[in-house]
């Protein structure tokens, strides 16, 4: 299909999404298994769907992940052969037929990744990853580096075998003749390597609806949707470390229809594009999606400098928290007010994780979410009120319920929340010092936060010399697993001290304020016992009730 033609990945297709630890490695493993099997029939790459766009040009509609991977793999094979020797005439013809003939590239990916594809994969003029600003671009580089690493240790004969198997492989194809038909086919086709996301399918649906109903506006609307999704794809790399693209679609739906109860994006979108107002909805919702991705990128950046925002994200519950942030940014609410809202939301989400209630927060917050336009006062006020209210329907998160929960034992599955509490407690100690120039610390600044049991769960073999209380039933059941016996440490710190005597561990407690607090508490009496745990437990519980 590539020989004598030019293949392009159209902009309405999803960008490269195969991952080196999954589909990319399976691609090579399958080829290697084929070579070992000695099967006479050519290797089969599956079915491909194309749209004919010119005399010898085609847009790949289904199978682009496989086709992109094939081209990347072939480039690494050609590069490896070139390191051994000059191309044979047959190899030179093959390279020019399916990779590049003079200045003509035979395959092009989506336009925002295509220059990278040329520079990093085909021409190898780019040797580093600086400036790669899309997730798909990073995956292209990952796939190329993975294949390059695999073939660099291969014998020339094996590289030649792989090249022959790939170049001579068979496939089946289907060709359509216009973009509308191609988009419709894409909606109903599934790439066998990775199923399209809901966002990708909705994008294709938008473009198909424009082709059918756009009339004189078709070209301008298609261009608008393509541009919006190009910006969206660039933003994905800035937010994928904490939210998936289909989740952003759902959050956008909640903001667009102003309800935390929205839950079925594809059904809701299908409902809207079946109405006579479909074109206006497509324009408005595409803009809303672009804004959501941009605003989440801002949020991801702002949380690096604002512990209130970071804390609101630390507990998860994104299905509630993120729509509030997206809407606040969209409405142009000042960052200082967004931070104030983040403090309130973070406190409530942490309470929710601590008390472990099944009561639904959406029903308690949806009305203030809907009312938020230029101020966060109603949101913050509602959360403050929920901390004190005694009414049964509202009281699941109040101080009485919270105190019962924090005074209980904290088992292993609670450690993630305990670490967040102690991080917030650390910042409370910093602010309590009243010294200027000391900013709160970011949770992400602590290298792999660990939860340290000051008195270890397993009794130290040195008995009295260990510096801990007697490990009787009361100590094990009522002290070992309390917050007062927990300390926040980095992973290297925690792993270095292990189950050592208290005096040795105490000497290392000099990094965080809460660590130095332990040193101060035991300055005259170097024993960590029930009384010390109870004293510290009270400090932490008082902090929680007064500050969360």
Please describe what each predicted stretch is.
Residues 199-202, 209-425:
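A cross-family structural signal marking well-folded subdomains
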